[in-house]
């Protein structure tokens, strides 16, 4: 099996989502040359055929476009997960770059501004990704790349578990909608426990949205099924709430590091089916 690796190329973000696990070093992103080395490492391993760019907010890496273009030129299937709020800024996201992605993933936890602000899914001016901006972004992406797949990621917490987002699926033709039960995360004093949601409330959210996307994917547990490389080029192990470093892709071959990662092959296969 060839794998998808999630490159968290920056931890910089214009949002401060209270559930987010991306609370590492915000200031010392790797250089373009270092990310090229990591991408070459993945290619040489023969184990990886797809890269997902994540963050933080990935477009905030100073060399975002160059990193994407390099990965594309190496033949990887590319996707991105973004909060969407900066994707209409051509200086950060040149529109032609949409053509390089097979999938555009957008984090959408609510379309209610009050909920989004309570979650921290807003910038310093409390501006959020409105439904109109979301629609505009999807329209732009499809105008550049008509075959691009639109995927939504919704993290279910106790702040949005009772909301109804079915209008998104009804109007925007979402190919895949991942509904993720928030994972408890503790790192360097950060703790998202106050937002934990019950299994019953999570199941209720999924049931309400079951008919509005071609592919609804509820995810209760992501443990050891998400291959994550942080903004320092390190493969992380999420077996416990405290993420641990498995090894550096700047210093070792990916295959060597991956062999030390107690990866859950079955859960991974179920996550990425289809």
UniProtKB/Swiss-Prot annotation:
Keywords: 4Fe-4S, Antiviral defense, Iron, Iron-sulfur, Lyase, Metal-binding, S-adenosyl-L-methionine. PROSITE patterns: RADICAL_SAM. GO terms for molecular function: 4 iron, 4 sulfur cluster binding; lyase activity; metal ion binding. InterPro entries: Aldolase_TIM, RSAD2/Viperin_antiviral, rSAM. Pfam families: Fer4_12, Radical_SAM. One of its GO terms (biological process) is defense response to virus. It catalyses: CTP + AH2 + S-adenosyl-L-methionine = 3'-deoxy-3',4'-didehydro-CTP + 5'-deoxyadenosine + L-methionine + A + H2O + H(+). Its EC number is 4.2.-.-. Expression of pVip6 in E.coli (strain MG1655) confers resistance to phages lambda, P1, SECphi6, SECphi8 and T7. Catalyzes the conversion of cytidine triphosphate (CTP) to 3'-deoxy-3',4'-didehydro-CTP (ddhCTP), probably via a SAM-dependent radical mechanism. The modified nucleotide represses transcription from T7 RNA polymerase-directed genes (possibly by acting as chain terminators), strongly suggesting these nucleotides block viral polymerase transcription. How this protein allows bacteria to resist viruses that do not encode their own RNA polymerase (such as lambda, P1) is unknown. This is S-adenosylmethionine-dependent nucleotide dehydratase. It comes from Selenomonas ruminantium.
């Amino acid at each position: 099996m060839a794998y998808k690796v999630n490159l968290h190329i920056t931890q910089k973000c214009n949002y401060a989502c209270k559930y987010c696990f991306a609370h590492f070093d915000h200031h010392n992103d790797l250089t373009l040359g270092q990310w090229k080395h990591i991408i070459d490492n993945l290619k040489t391993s023969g184990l990886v055929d797809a890269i997902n760019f994540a963050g933080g907010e990935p477009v905030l890496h100073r060399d975002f476009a160059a990193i994407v273009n390099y990965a594309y030129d190496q033949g990887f299937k590319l996707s991105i997960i973004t909060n969407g709020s900066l994707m209409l800024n051509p200086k950060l996201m040149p529109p032609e770059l949409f053509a390089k992605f097979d999938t555009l993933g957008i984090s959408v936890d609510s379309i209610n501004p009050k909920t989004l602000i309570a979650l921290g899914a807003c910038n310093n001016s409390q501006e959020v990704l409105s439904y109109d901006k979301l629609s505009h972004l999807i329209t732009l992406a499809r105008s550049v790349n008509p075959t691009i797949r639109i995927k939504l990621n919704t993290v279910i917490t106790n702040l949005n578990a009772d909301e109804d987002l079915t209008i998104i699926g009804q109007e925007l033709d979402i190919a895949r909608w991942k509904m993720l039960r928030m994972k408890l995360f503790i790192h360097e004093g950060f703790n998202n426990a106050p937002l934990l949601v019950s299994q019953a409330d999570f199941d209720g959210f999924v049931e309400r949205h079951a008919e509005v996307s071609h592919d609804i994917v509820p995810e209760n547990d992501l443990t050891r099924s998400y291959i994550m490389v942080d903004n320092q080029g390190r493969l992380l192990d999420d077996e416990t709430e405290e993420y641990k470093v498995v090894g550096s892709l700047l210093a070792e071959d990916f295959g060597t590091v991956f062999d030390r990662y107690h990866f859950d092959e079955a859960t991974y296969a179920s996550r990425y089916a289809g």
